[in-house]
Amino acid sequence: MLKKSLIWMFTALFLLMFQTFTPAFASTKHVPQAPSAIYKVDTTKKVVALTFDISWGEKMPGPILNVLNTKNIHKATFFLSGPWIMHHQEIAKQIKSMGYEIGSHGYMHKDFSEQTDNWIREQMGKAEHSFKEVLNLKPTLVRTPNGDFDQRVLRLLNQMGYTVIQWNTDSLDWKNPGVEYMVSRVTTRAVPGDIILMHASDSAKQTAAALPQIIDGLRAKGYQFVTVSELISGVESHTRVQ
């Protein structure tokens, strides 16, 4: 009788354990990761990526390229819009010939989250045509106009073969807040693995003046400069889902 009781007790215990752990096993099913944008990478290495958006103008790219060259910065990433490339082909070619990484900044400067899928595909296709015709390349990195996107946009751009790049430190040069302010803002906020946002469009009138001090300040803190692709290659990217 005792033997039968023990058998029933162990059987009931086994069934209870099975019911308890089965949901846990079920929860381990693979769940596709939501698309996301990259703002920085998690690393202890003192590396940062300088990035420059260009959508219009021809006055500021030259001075900024001169600063980068004078300061021996051979690694930076430029995000160029399609129309700008077509209207300023020689400057675009100069950026490429100097060895800087080039990503897409789309075509028309409108918020992607407010547009249809077909509109986005059409715009990115036009931009790709500009890159191919002038620079003979197809970017794999994209920074959306105004940094605007949502989950739908991220998923669509990922399907088109693009990695969406944002920034962790905004220089605010697009506001022209003053050279000293920009230098202080970037050099105090930058952290290892940072992506730093700046502009080489004509509307950013103070960037070229602030850039030498930003470079010197970051170097004084031990930072080295890499491209975005180098930054995100082989390390865990810090992403955010909008």
Question: What do these predicted regions represent?
Answer:
Residues 1-51, 66-77, 192-242:
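Terminal accessory/targeting
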Residues 63, 94, 110-197, 201-224, ...:
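Catalytic domains of cell-wall/extracellular-matrix polysaccharide-remodeling enzymes
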